[in-house]
Regions:
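Hydrophobic ligand-binding cavity/cleft-lining segments
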Residues: 1-38
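A generic structural signal for beta-strand entry/edge sites
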Residues: 4-6, 44, 64-66, 92-97
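Beta-strand/loop substructures that line and gate deep hydrophobic ligand-binding cavities in soluble
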Residues: 70-125
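Hydrophobic pocket/interface hotspot
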Residues: 20-21, 30, 45, 58, ...
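Short, surface-exposed coil-to-beta transition loops
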Residues: 6-8, 52-56, 78-84
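Glycine-rich portal/gate segments that line the openings of hydrophobic small-molecule binding cavities
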Residues: 28-75
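A short, structured loop/turn motif at beta-sheet edges
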Residues: 17-18, 59-64, 87-96
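Generic structural detector for well-ordered beta-strands
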Residues: 8-14, 46-48, 57, 86-88
């Protein structure tokens, strides 16, 4: 198995941290843009997309800051990866900067980046930006 490599993407969002908290942290909010359905039991999030499902364990969540998970499949395979969405207000421009940190095998990175671009386009649509 090829080692997954970390990458980070940044996006400017014209929204408030309060709105972003709902969309990034709550199952209902995530279901509006990230997955078709999100079910949470204890610290395990089950994401449903196009008839498939993936599970991720919550590693960190903080209102006003963001959320971080590890895919259960990676955890079971002993692969130390995570995916994270964190945000801050730029002190100069006062816009919200969303940083997405994820991992992908080098051969898959371009496809994973395109998937994130599509997801963030959906997020922009939901927030009306």
């Amino acid at each position: 198995m090829t080692k997954k490599e970390q990458f980070e993407l940044e996006y400017v969002l014209k929204t408030s941290p309060k709105v972003l908290d709902k969309l990034l942290i709550t199952p209902d909010g995530l279901s509006e843009w990230f997955a078709e359905d999100v079910i949470v039991k204890d610290d395990v999030y089950t994401f449903h997309w196009d008839g498939s499902e993936e599970q991720a364990r919550l590693l960190h969540r903080k209102t006003g800051e963001g959320i971080k998970w590890q895919w259960i499949d990676d955890e079971e395979d002993g692969i130390e990866t995570f995916f994270e969405m964190r945000y801050m207000i730029d002190p100069m421009t006062k816009v919200v900067i969303l940083s997405v940190v994820d991992f992908a095998e080098p051969v898959d990175k371009e496809q994973v980046v395109r998937l994130w671009e599509s997801q963030i386009t959906d997020l922009h649509r939901v927030i009306g930006a």
